[in-house]
Amino acid sequence: TDVANKSKRPIMISFNGGPGSGSLWMHMAYTGPMVLNIDKEGFPVQPYGVKSNPYSVLDVADIVYVNPVNTGYSRIVDRRVKRETFFGINADIKYLAEWINTFIQRNNRWESPKYLIGESYGTVRVAGLALALQNRQWMYLNGVILVSPTELGIDSSRPDADGRTGPLGAALRLSLIHI
């Protein structure tokens, strides 16, 4: 960031879906200052290219786009490292929580408001990371943003779903209990 007082500027750590898909789509379709010129269905429209994103939060927050191992151009460099270190839900969450902790420390961002944002499978990742950061790194987040959280059981396109099933469904129905 180029802001003098980093402690007041929020930081958002962004993960795309996948597994396998890099964070490019979070950058170029959702949160970046420029986005692809696409229609509401996600198809390119003419003129092809990019356009300004009036919804980008870059003017009020720093965004860190993360490509976990084997997404985007991220690969295991040392062939002696066991694949189990990075692959699997728990392994993924463990090493990414450690990486986030290191990143926050090295960039002196402990006092900054911290947010995780995940899209599709990234929603599963950030849900697990929120817990791991709190329990293992003593890092309490200011928020978690879920984009297209189909992996959390709220996919209303499934024929057997009412749009409020799975573990998140109970939380979504909670307000109905109090009415």
What are these regions (language model features)?
Residues 177-179:
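Conserved small/polar residues in nucleotide/adenosyl-binding loops
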Residues 22-23, 150-160, 167:
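A short beta-to-alpha transition loop/helix N-cap that caps and shapes the active-site region
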Residues 115, 143-145:
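Residue in the alpha/beta-hydrolase core beta-strand immediately N-terminal to the catalytic nucleophile
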Residues 68, 145-154:
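Active-site nucleophile loop of the alpha/beta-hydrolase fold
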Residues 109-120:
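Alpha/beta-hydrolase fold nucleophile elbow
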Residues 118-130:
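Glycine-rich nucleophile elbow surrounding the catalytic serine of serine-hydrolase chemistry
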Residues 86-104:
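Alpha/beta-hydrolase active-site loop
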Residues 1-87:
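N-terminal cap/lid subdomain of alpha/beta-hydrolase-fold enzymes
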